[in-house]
A protein has these predicted regions:
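Glycine-rich phosphate-binding loop of ATP-dependent small-molecule kinases
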Residues: 1-181
Length: 181
């Protein structure tokens, strides 16, 4: 399993979908799982930029993992967002015949993120919500990278600026190296 880390608008979804299309992998996005959820509490939190609580997030992810063949490479996007989720993931992946092969961190300047998110047109992509989501990402999610590194999980940083194809070439190379380690 490859974990995608990066702030909203860094291109994780686009690159995840390309890896699926070109390699036959499975892309799991907690954001996509949440947006397709019927739970009104999830939609309320999405609209305000708040994180979904760990218990509900873990449940949604656990159910999604049950539906994927353990031999299929999975790209996990948007999870874990905090150290408790990282611990839960490391503890529960073996139940699904999986482990974390590596983490790929997408890096994009904040001005570019604001432009991308404003152009994207999702309901939650208004400036106030974008700023809140970026602040939450830096405050809560970034320390997870340090925790995963402390657990011996390889982490690679990738410049996610440029054309979709340029970024994809970088991501493809790093992802391929991760799973062959």
């Amino acid at each position: 399993m490859v974990l995608f880390f990066g702030p909203p608008g860094s291109g994780k979804s686009v690159q995840g979908e390309l890896l699926v299309e070109r390699n036959g992998w499975q892309w799991l996005s907690t954001g996509k799982l949440f947006r397709s959820s019927k739970d009104p509490e999830i939609h309320k939190r999405l609209a305000t930029g708040e994180l979904i609580d760990d218990k509900l997030t873990n449940k949604v992810l656990n159910e999604a993992l049950k539906d994927i063949n353990s031999k299929t490479m999975v790209i996990l996007d948007g999870y874990p967002r905090n150290i408790d989720q990282a611990r839960w993931l490391i503890e529960h992946l073996p139940n699904h015949g999986r482990e974390i092969d590596c983490v790929i961190e997408f890096v994009v300047p904040e001005e570019e993120l604001m432009r991308r998110l404003s152009d994207r047109g999702r309901e939650e992509d208004v400036r106030e919500v974008i700023e809140r989501r970026l602040a939450i990402y830096h405050e809560k999610t970034t320390p997870v990278l340090d925790y995963l590194k402390s657990q011996g999980i390889m982490t690679q940083t990738v410049n996610a600026e440029g054309s979709i194809e340029e970024v994809h070439e970088r991501i493809q190379g790093v992802a391929a190296a991760c799973i062959q380690k």
